[in-house]
Regions:
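Conserved oxyanion/phosphate-binding beta-strand-loop segments in alpha/beta enzyme cores
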Residues: 2-42, 72-81, 104-112, 217, ...
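Glycine- and acidic
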Residues: 2-5, 44-53, 126-130, 333-341, ...
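NTP-handling and nucleic-acid-processing catalytic cores
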Residues: 4-19, 55, 141-367, 475-477, ...
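Residue patterns forming the tRNA-binding/recognition surfaces of aminoacyl-tRNA synthetases
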Residues: 8, 16-17, 21-25, 97-254, ...
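N-terminal catalytic cores of NTP/NDP-binding nucleotidyl/phosphoryl-transfer enzymes
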Residues: 31-102, 129-144, 251-252, 318-354, ...
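Helix-rich, typically C-terminal accessory recognition domains appended to large enzymatic cores
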Residues: 150-151, 155-162, 419-448, 569-572, ...
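Conserved phosphate/anionic-ligand binding catalytic regions in large, soluble enzymes, centered on
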Residues: 247-269, 428, 434-435, 440, ...
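Alpha-helical recognition segments enriched in aromatics with Gly/Pro capping
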Residues: 313-336, 365, 485-623
Length: 815
């Protein structure tokens, strides 16, 4: 046999070789129907921008891929599909900018993305790829709409919505930042009244919130969702006008009712016209017109100066019997509670600010330790933990929590109050007045009304419009395609009209994980047997920026489909982990700063495996890190060291038959490294796993590495540097994929050192440390301690009166 001479590590040739080998052998293919130990490893499918993958994408995908590869080595049948979220305003706007139809642009972008994703070594099974723009996919998006429509969860109603003059479409509240569009930070968002389709997600507010308590999700993600759902426990209290109008208000603090000195209605409240006097009508109407043009997010802002006008009318405070003035103000929103509040300026900051501005009465009704009914209020005091009621006849002196229940019960007995739970969450507006999206499958007939498109007629295919530019009319460009929207009514056959709005792109991504296992099926959206086998998703990794929109909507759609009998589970993701953010040289990446990292450049220069490991080594995966060009060379040097060890082991094995035995110290370190790396990889602590492998490699270089030691190292490296590990595995004499070899064998007994360090104390003070054999008996350890010169200085030859002995840890000599 000819000697094989050591060679240098060439990442480009190694990676090209193994990507081709994986393709030929079907290494990354999963037996989806026949899997015995299914593990669905999901990563957030990307929007295929023209710019291609950015480093944030790669950071997210590689972290998820490492988890999938680790689970495969652990014996699972891992399903790691990928697809493309290609509908939506981003694609449409870019197409308009470059003058190319999105139907031409998107396939080119997807092709580039797919090439890049393969290049970085993802273990994706591309046979199950989905594209949201494919009619074979959005047929089922439309089917889901129809299921919710028939279940009463999809409704059309007129509503005040956020309208971006630049995007020329409706925005969700989450897309409005400080009153401006998130996509156009210099464009002020307007309010418009439009007929829109909504999914009634508010009906699921309670389970959406309650299920978070037991969800195995990143704590930060759960907190964001819980705050967005925003449960408030309180009471609905009725104020009556002299004319008999009942104005219900929601309050979380009925104990402060005696301090309610005025009422405030939202300008949109239906009773405003009824309670406004003729003297105040002109002022009130003008104010309502001004507020109607404001966006809801700005109105909610705590920093915004409060404005309002008096209606001229009064209502009766049900607790005091006093008449309180009725105002309207922009800081009260119709979409929360009842659209009316009882203002308690003594104990609410917004009410205090408004009362000071309008010179309205301010009364203390809760006093803390050292305060009484006459203690002045320099500012609102909303939270008084040990507060008791004052200026509240019949309840003075009661703790506020007790008074809260008592006042609610007393008013409930009179029919003037009832306990109520409110939520901050609003229904999901899915209508979009744009072109590039799935048409909403509804037909309007003058005779039959609103008619769902029959399922047999799905998909409602998006027509190929040459002119798809949006306008300011409040309707979609599809409203200009008369030959498309004019259709016979499915019920009566008369000429009818299609819905011309398209659905929100977040609906596309709210169910894509359900489609993956059945992506090759045209007869069902998701096969019942496959869905039961693979769902809920075992591991989902993505960005926290999707906590409110995508993740909330995906949970809602799954819950709705369960209630409608289509799936057997309520929660789609068994585990979710939010990854961190990558910055460049301490600064957030942006084109304007010129510090955007192009992954292709680094993969070309350093290789995909070096790039993968460097990204994972930047810092804790769930926090992110700072990308600095100087750091990546250290990872390359590490891989070069491993390569040299493998090459040396290969040539020595040829010469000596590979019969060498490793030292006990190296065996012990190998097992300790296996323990650390497998544990850290499972918990996504990738940076510390890599650090442990680096320590192990340094020890191997200082010792005599054998094939067993290097095989264990190669298996540990496989999730992180898959091409590199495959090549090392082959060079160590194996003919099958490293991904089929399993995790290295771990023996806890061999990870424990034979010797331990005893702390020796004299009278409770540390005087020395001794290295002794593990399991040393007490009498032997005490004798060794007494013989230690450092200890003898303090014992002066005396025998101890008492010995405190902790096996393998402590000898304390008490004289």
């Amino acid at each position: 046999m000819a000697d094989r001479r050591p060679s240098a590590y060439d990442p480009q040739s190694v990676e090209q070789k193994w990507q081709q080998r994986w393709e030929e052998r079907g290494t990354n293919r999963t037996d989806v129907p026949g899997a015995a130990r299914p593990f669905f490893n999901l990563m957030m499918f990307p929007y295929p921008s023209a710019e291609g993958l950015h480093v944030g994408n790669v950071f997210a995908f590689v972290g998820a891929d490492i988890q999938g590869r680790y689970q495969r080595l652990a014996g699972h049948d891992v399903f790691e599909p990928l697809g493309f979220d290609a509908f939506g305003i981003h694609s449409e706007n870019f197409a308009l900018k470059v003058g190319t139809h999105p139907a031409e642009l998107i396939p080119r972008n997807i092709e580039r993305f797919r090439m890049q994703l393969k290049r970085i070594g993802l273990m994706a099974d591309w046979r199950y790829e989905v594209q949201t723009t494919d009619p074979r996919y959005y047929r089922w998006t439309q089917w889901i709409f129809l299921q919710l429509f028939r279940g009463g969860l999809a409704v059309k109603r007129r509503a005040a919505v956020n309208w971006c003059p630049a995007c020329k479409t409706v925005l969700a509240n989450e897309q409005v930042i400080g009153g401006f569009c998130e996509r156009h930070p210099d464009v002020k968002v307007e309010q418009r009244m439009l007929d829109q389709w909504f999914f009634t997600i508010t009906r699921y507010a309670a389970p959406l919130l309650d299920n978070l308590e037991t969800a195995d999700w990143s704590h930060s993600t759960k907190t964001i969702q819980a705050n967005w759902i925003g449960r408030s426990e309180g009471a609905e209290v009725v104020f009556e006008t002299p004319g008999g109008k009942r104005i219900p208000v929601f309050t979380t603090r009925p104990d402060t009712l005696f301090g309610a000195t005025y009422l405030v209605l939202a300008p949109e409240h239906p009773l405003v016209s009824d309670v406004t006097t003729s003297e105040c009508r002109t002022v009130v109407n003008e104010y309502r017109r001004r507020v109607a043009a404001m966006d809801l997010v700005s109105r909610k802002s705590v920093e915004k100066a409060k404005t309002g006008v008096f209606t001229g009318s009064y209502a009766r405070n049900p607790a005091t019997g006093a008449s309180v003035p009725i105002w309207i103000a922009d800081y009260v929103l119709m979409e929360y509670g009842t659209g009316a509040i009882m203002a308690v300026p003594g104990h609410d900051e917004r009410d205090f600010e408004f009362a000071m501005q309008m010179k309205l009465p301010i009364v203390r009704v809760v006093a803390g330790p050292g305060q009484d009914a006459a203690t002045p209020l320099a500012a609102a005091e909303p939270d008084i933990p040990e507060g008791r009621l004052v200026n509240s006849p019949g309840y003075d002196g009661k703790p506020w929590e007790e008074a809260k229940r008592a006042i609610t019960a007393a008013l409930a007995a009179k029919g003037l109050a009832k306990p109520v739970t409110n939520y901050r969450l609003h229904d999901w507006c899915i209508s979009r007045q744009r072109y590039w999206g799935p048409p909403i499958p509804i037909i309007y007939c003058d005779t039959c009304g609103t008619v769902p498109v029959p399922e047999k007629d799905l998909p409602v295919v998006l027509p190929a419009l040459e002119d798809f530019r949006p306008d300011d009319s409040g309707v979609s460009p599809l409203a200009r395609a008369e030959s498309w929207y004019r259709v016979p009514c499915p019920k009566c056959g008369k000429l009818a009209r299609r819905e011309t709005d398209v659905s929100d792109t977040f609906l596309d991504s709210a169910w894509y994980f359900l489609r993956y296992p059945s992506a090759d099926r045209d007869d069902v959206p998701f096969d019942a047997t496959l869905t039961k086998k693979w769902l809920p998703v075992a591991s989902y990794i993505g960005g926290n920026e999707h906590a409110v929109l995508h993740l909330m909507y995906a949970r809602f759609i799954t819950m709705a489909l369960k209630d409608l009998g289509h799936v057997s589970f309520a929660e789609p993701f068994a585990r979710f982990r939010a990854h961190g953010t990558i910055v460049k040289d301490g600064a957030k990446m942006s084109k304007s700063r010129g510090n955007v990292v192009n992954p292709d450049q680094y993969v070309e220069q350093w290789g995909a495996d070096t790039f993968r490991m460097y990204l994972m080594f930047l810092g804790p995966y769930q926090e992110g890190g700072d990308f600095r060009d100087a750091g990546i060379s250290g990872i390359r040097r590490f891989l070069d060291k491993v390569w040299a060890l493998v090459e040396t082991a290969g040539t020595e094995a040829q010469a000596h038959g590979g019969t060498g035995k490793p030292s006990p110290e190296l065996v012990r370190m190998m097992h300790r490294t296996i323990q650390r790396v497998t544990s850290d990889t499972a918990s996504l602590d990738y940076n510390t796993a890599i650090a442990a492998m680096m320590e192990y490699v340094n020890a191997l270089r200082d010792g005599t590495p054998t094939r067993d030691l290097l095989e264990s190292l190669t298996l540990l490296l496989a999730p992180y540097a898959p091409h590199f590990a495959e090549e090392c595995w082959e060079r160590l004499g194996h003919t099958t994929s490293v991904m089929d070899a399993g995790l290295p064998r771990f023996d806890p007994a061999l990870a424990v050192a034979d010797e331990v360090e005893f702390v020796v104390q004299v009278g409770g003070k540390v005087r020395s440390r001794l290295t002794l054999a593990r399991g040393t008996p007490e009498e032997v350890a005490v004798a060794a301690a007494l013989a230690d010169p450092a200890v003898r200085k303090f014992t002066e030859g005396k025998q101890p009166n008492k010995v405190v002995f902790v096996p393998d840890r402590l000898v304390n000599l008490v004289l």
